[in-house]
């Protein structure tokens, strides 16, 4: 559904968590044994999408466990990201020789509550998106920043606040993230490009960080 938001050499798979899915590995089941049913369904479909994407890169099925920050632990040589919302899970993976990180986020294509919007988007960012309804623009800003935070975590192992970056739309379906603080090997002023799509009732954001030799 959103393959065109990511490079052609990355594998992207999506699915509906409400539909039946392939059983999880026992090690994965243990991670969500005490979770509510909705969380279990989203986790299961997300892992199923991730394995389907990995198969396209030539990797055999295996358990995908979680790190201490609940991030997926990918096979050696792989970068990836999983996202889900009501009615949709998406996974994207690529080769680590080509990419230093990838982050994706899917959201309902609906206005963000005002109280949340004020915590994730600056007035300048909102003004730059004046062609969209304000709270829908805030949803896009939230999604794009979430995608970047997942992507940069591969490099920095650091958490960033919503106002540690600024978002700028460059063209229809594209955006740029400007880093406003130093974060590990990433420096204040660094700029990263991403893409967003609005389809079938969803907003989707994606950003990749090329490996050093591809910069």
Residue ranges and their predicted role:
Residues 1-215:
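Core catalytic alpha/beta fold that binds nucleotide/phospho-ligands
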């Amino acid at each position: 559904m959103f393959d065109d938001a990511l490079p052609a050499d990355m594998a992207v798979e999506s699915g509906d968590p409400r539909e039946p899915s392939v059983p999880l590995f026992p090690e994965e089941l243990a991670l969500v044994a005490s979770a509510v049913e909705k969380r279990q369904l989203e986790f299961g479909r997300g892992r199923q999408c991730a394995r389907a994407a990995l198969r396209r890169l030539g990797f055999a099925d295996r358990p995908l466990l979680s790190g201490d920050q609940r991030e997926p632990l990918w096979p050696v040589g792989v970068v990836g990201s999983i996202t889900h919302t009501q009615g949709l899970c998406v996974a994207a993976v690529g080769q680590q020789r080509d990419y230093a990180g990838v982050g994706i986020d899917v959201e309902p294509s609906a206005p963000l509550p005002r109280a949340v919007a004020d915590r994730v988007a600056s007035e300048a960012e909102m003004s730059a998106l004046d062609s969209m309804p304000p709270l829908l623009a805030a949803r896009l800003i939230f999604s794009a920043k979430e995608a970047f935070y997942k992507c940069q975590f591969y490099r920095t192992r650091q958490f960033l606040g919503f106002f540690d970056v600024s978002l700028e739309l460059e063209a229809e379906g594209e955006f740029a993230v400007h880093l406003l603080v130093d974060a590990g090997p990433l420096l204040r002023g660094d700029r990263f490009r991403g893409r967003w799509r609005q389809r079938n009732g969803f907003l989707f954001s994606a950003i990749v960080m090329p490996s050093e030799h591809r910069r």
